[in-house]
């Protein structure tokens, strides 16, 4: 925490904050008309303090800061932690949170996800599995991209029967600190 704070710009971040009842699952409300969390403008120190406060809780509230531009919010961080990609200067983002999970989604750019602390499991699906992932509303989304309506931790196969086919094509990897994964453009991931 202190290391990240040493680069803090002091600008507030957008955090997704939910009570313990959502069990870390950033998702829609029951009508699919809104969300099961609130957006809050918090400073990095506040987010990190909340994460530390609830670190050992068996049912913590959810705190999640997603896809936050490193150059804007953590100036100088990149000079000490960048990947040497020769002439390429990709956008560098950071995701910070506790036991939070975003439903399967895709990103337009190819991504490299690096695990700095804790563990992070990724489940990837090739783009041709879109038809088996049951995508939710495209005009109202929790984090920008459409997401799957399937709860991967407790799939309802009666409601989403083709999800079993998607799982047959899934690739799963668990990252630990120092590990990285390349996520190709348009591949669905969770």
Where are these regions (language model features)?
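N-terminal accessory scaffold of Fe(II)-dependent oxygenases
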Residues: 1-180, 188-190
């Amino acid at each position: 925490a202190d290391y990240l704070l040493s680069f803090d710009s002091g600008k507030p971040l957008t955090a997704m904050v939910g009570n313990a009842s959502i069990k870390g699952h950033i998702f829609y409300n029951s009508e699919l008309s809104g969300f099961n969390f609130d957006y809050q403008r918090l400073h990095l120190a506040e987010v990190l303090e909340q994460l530390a406060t609830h670190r050992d809780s068996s049912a913590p509230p959810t705190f999640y800061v997603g896809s936050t531009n490193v150059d804007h919010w953590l100036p100088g961080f990149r000079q000490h932690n960048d990947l040497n990609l020769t002439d390429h200067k990709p956008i560098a983002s950071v995701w910070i949170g506790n036991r939070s999970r975003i439903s399967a989604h895709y990103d337009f750019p190819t991504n490299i996800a690096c695990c700095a602390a804790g563990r992070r499991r990724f489940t990837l699906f090739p783009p041709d599995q879109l038809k088996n992932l049951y995508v939710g509303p495209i005009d109202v989304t929790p984090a920008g991209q459409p997401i799957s309506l399937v709860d991967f931790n407790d799939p309802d196969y009666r409601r989403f029967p083709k999800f079993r086919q998607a799982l047959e094509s899934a690739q799963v990897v668990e990252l630990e600190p120092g590990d990285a994964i390349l996520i190709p453009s348009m591949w669905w991931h969770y």
